């Protein structure tokens, strides 16, 4: 077991330091305006200069996280600083909320009803504070987190997804705030961070439906099952990501039994829904009644559900010592590494057909860039090393 974990730890580290980070520093980092481009073709050539604001925060987080966990590479720290500077200069609207897309030089293009741009910027600032030792960034992260809570709590501040006819709440914001709060808590203490995690953990109970053995993406305000195509959606990768966020929090609390058990249940159920017995890999969407999902990418294999499953299975093994989770880790890791990496041009493909063939070869766009893959490598390296101590 020790040799298995050490081998994977080294593979994750080498892939991060020799492939993923160099690819994005070479092809993504904007050395003129600051920040990072993510819309790049298979070979890294730029196909659109539009900048994803999500990825300004995500990349600054990853570069800082790699610096803090893998090696003190000054290029990573400088890249994180450049991207945070770009965020502060260009990515905030006058109301304190953030944009979704900006031009190469930072002029606003789109703003959306989410607070994901803010969440990613907050974890970037927190991680950069730890990397640089400049605690003003920890304070900025905490302020932004409090702003996020205010935006969510203020009626009319964020446009609702549905009109009043449908009262619903979504899984995404509940789970992302666990991770956002826990990353900030690493560098600065505030009661609001633990309060948010407690609230999110409680709220997640509403999305768990034992009758379907599933965590759903959308429910009514009090957890009511919404029997529509959208209400029946299971996003296995998303649920698996939530499971590891919960396991990370359980570990923080000395392996809290209740949180651990809930997280493992979500992981086990979501693996059953997501793992493709015929072709391997985690598929995109299922319907909890086994009806046809609406999303046309429903049976595709995207990059990020695989990376989240790699992290979650390692956490589950750490929590339980049950070797079934190592077997799941082996399955998902081997399948992922057999299908996603591009051995010719570097980095990973993002979008595969169900059978594992490449659907389109670009290495990045507004939604795919240096986040899930490098975060998986850093986190999994860390977990493998802990497990071999």
Predicted regions: what they are:
Residues 1-389:
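Glycan-recognition and catalytic cores of secretory/periplasmic carbohydrate-active enzymes
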């Amino acid at each position: 077991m020790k040799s298995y974990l050490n081998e994977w730890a080294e593979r994750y580290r080498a892939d991060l330091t020799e492939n993923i980070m160099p690819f994005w520093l070479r092809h993504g980092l904007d050395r003129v305006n600051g920040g990072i481009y993510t819309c790049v073709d298979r070979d890294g050539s730029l196909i659109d200069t539009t900048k994803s604001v999500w990825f300004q925060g995500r990349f600054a987080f990853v570069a800082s996280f790699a610096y803090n966990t893998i090696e003190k590479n000054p290029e990573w720290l400088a890249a994180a600083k450049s991207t945070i500077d770009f965020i502060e200069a260009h990515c905030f609207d006058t109301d304190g909320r953030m944009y979704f897309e900006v031009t190469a030089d930072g002029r606003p293009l789109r703003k959306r009803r989410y607070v994901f741009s803010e969440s990613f910027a907050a974890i970037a600032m927190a991680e950069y504070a730890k990397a640089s030792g400049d605690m003003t960034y920890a304070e900025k992260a905490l302020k932004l987190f409090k702003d996020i809570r205010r935006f969510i709590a203020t009626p009319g501040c964020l446009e609702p997804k549905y009109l009043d006819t449908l009262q619903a709440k979504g899984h995404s914001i509940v789970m992302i705030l666990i991770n956002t709060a826990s990353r900030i808590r690493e560098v600065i203490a505030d009661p609001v961070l633990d309060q948010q995690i407690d609230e999110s953990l409680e709220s997640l109970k509403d999305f768990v439906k034992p009758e379907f053995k599933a965590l759903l993406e959308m429910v009514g305000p009090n957890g009511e099952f919404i029997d529509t195509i959208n209400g029946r959606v299971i996003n296995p990768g998303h649920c698996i990501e939530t499971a590891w966020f919960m396991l990370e929090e359980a570990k923080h609390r000395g392996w809290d039994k209740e949180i651990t058990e809930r997280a493992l249940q979500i992981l086990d159920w979501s693996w059953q829904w997501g793992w493709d017995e015929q072709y391997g890999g985690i598929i995109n969407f299922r319907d909890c009644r086994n009806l046809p999902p609406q999303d046309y990418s429903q049976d595709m294999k995207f990059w990020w559900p695989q990376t989240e499953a790699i992290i979650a299975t390692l956490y589950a093994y750490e929590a339980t010592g049950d070797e079934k989770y190592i077997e799941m880790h082996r399955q998902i890791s081997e399948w992922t590494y057999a299908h996603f990496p591009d051995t010719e041009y570097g980095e990973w493909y993002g979008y595969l057909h169900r059978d594992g063939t490449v659907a389109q070869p670009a290495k990045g766009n507004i939604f795919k860039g240096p986040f899930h893959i490098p975060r998986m490598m850093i986190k999994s390296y860390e977990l493998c090393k802990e497990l071999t101590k």
